[in-house]
Amino acid sequence: MSNPRHNEREVRSPRGDELNAKSWLTEAPLRMLMNNLDPDVAERPHELVVYGGIGRAARTWDDFDRIVATLKTLNDDETLLVQSGKPVGVFRTHKDAPRVLIANSNLVPHWANWDHFNELDKKGLAMYGQMTAGSWIYIGAQGIVQGTYETFVEAGRQHYGGNLKGRWILTGGLGGMGGAQPLAAVMAGACCLAVECDETRADFRLRTRYVDEKTHSLDEALAKIDAWTKAGEAKSIALIGNAAEIFPELVKRGVKPDIVTDQTSAHDPVHGYLPLGWTVAEWRAKQENDPKAVEKAARASMKVQVQAMLDFWNAGIPTVDYGNNIRQMALEEGLENAFAFPGFVPAYIRPLFCRGIGPFRWAALSGDPEDIAKTDAKVKELLPDNKHLHNWLDMAKERIAFQGLPARICWVGLGDRHRLGLAFNEMVRNGELKAPIVIGRDHLDSGSVASPNRETEAMKDGSDAVSDWPLLNALLNTASGATWVSLHHGGGVGMGFSQHAGMVICCDGTEDADRRLERVLWNDPATGVMRHADAGYDIALDWARKQGLRLPAILGN
């Protein structure tokens, strides 16, 4: 029997200003869905896998075809409902309603675990959407580069006087998310040694200039890191190997990185983490015929790696979990102090979230890189005093290779996002841009996620696991008129550990879009300020007052 999730066809988004659908509001999700499966974007496009273990864009290839066909005929007063990658219904709504509403991987809490999900997945009843895979706004590794860069810069500020020159970062994983780490480290002024078990992923990062060099030798990798740091150069190297083997070996040798983290796909113990002593081919085969054995061996291996990370931490080396739930896996394997070192959000990012600052991103539906160059310039024009952001945009222009449709990631917050959206829409209206653009974000944002081991770890009021907030965020974005809205479970950290929402809005140059953009791009980050103000963060409370938010139970207004 043929595999409904495997097809050798090549998918690429249309370019230019010619419509394949009835309007840009349906053309936009069509192009971004297809862009998610572009071979220059997705990790395993022939299997519908975009990134993050088994994060897919559609449940099966038949479902992909049905979604495409439906979007091509969808009217501007209709909404398509997508249930775990399957187009289940079209309903009449109104012109300001989302054209697509997506729910991926959601399970009743008692059943929200990998065993039950994998059973449903095997029967063809579910799909893992990760965060931006099933919500059709993945833009390649660039999507996490700036967040990783901001994390490394803040780590340098806290631990090394704001200067990472001559220092190096040890990490694992070069997949769709982890692949951003070497480039982010170099942009922050540091060297990076990234351990990756799958050589094809390292080659992908080499091809797209996210990593500088590759080796199979630990000794060679360390020699290069030593030479680069002594010379004050910022360069990166991918080491083909298993992090569960390499990290303990470095501890044994007494090697001391300056920062330690990890972005293997440890959130998924079957599809995301190579067990110690296994070949990649053996691992892939047993995922299908003996997943329980894979999970058992992978979890034991994660415990070994986390113990090594604890050893680095206990040696005084800044060590953080980068949101893949590897500490939780080690804890469940009996490593009682697995959470001794922090996650990256409470350690470095939360003050940004308190002001609604997060991973704002946009993509040029024209396919023309010049449209991104023009929007980059517009950002600088509208935010003239944000020199840190200007520096980021300059580095991004120089170092980041576009994957699929040209796109940009740019961390901005409440008060700035709607201004940029309106300016971009005006650029479409007056012909400065060759076609409309879409604006979206990662689900990793200030008000759109509940994830106690990542974004909402160690909240001031103890509300880490309260998931009302992403539900309210999705509802508000729907009411505000986003072009498509998504509500997912399990992204980043795996089944049972997160709920999160996403939105994308199309700048088609119309006055209707102006009104929608102003609502969506104000309300969306405002929910993040609200959420952190409710938890008692002074930065968020002050920002809420400054921005004039009406928060009756929080500000009493």
Curated annotation (Swiss-Prot):
Catalytic residues in the record: 410
Record GO terms (molecular function): urocanate hydratase activity
PROSITE patterns: UROCANASE
EC number: 4.2.1.49
InterPro entries recorded: Urocanase, Urocanase-like, Urocanase_C, Urocanase_central_sf, Urocanase_CS, Urocanase_N, Urocanase_Rossmann-like, Urocanase_sf
Pathway in which this enzyme or protein is active: Amino-acid degradation; L-histidine degradation into L-glutamate; N-formimidoyl-L-glutamate from L-histidine: step 2/3
Residues reported in the UniProt entry to bind NAD(+): 52-53, 130, 176-178, 196, 201, 242-243, 263-267, 273-274, 322, 492
Reaction(s) the record says it catalyses: 4-imidazolone-5-propanoate = trans-urocanate + H2O
Main location: cytoplasm
Region feature (Disordered): 1-20
Co-factor remark: Binds 1 NAD(+) per subunit.
Any one biological process term the GO annotation gives: L-histidine catabolic process to glutamate and formamide
UniProt subcellular location: Cytoplasm
Coiled coil location: none
Database matches in PANTHER family: UROCANATE HYDRATASE
Job description of the protein: Catalyzes the conversion of urocanate to 4-imidazolone-5-propionate.
Similarity remark: Belongs to the urocanase family.
The protein's name in its UniProt record: Urocanate hydratase
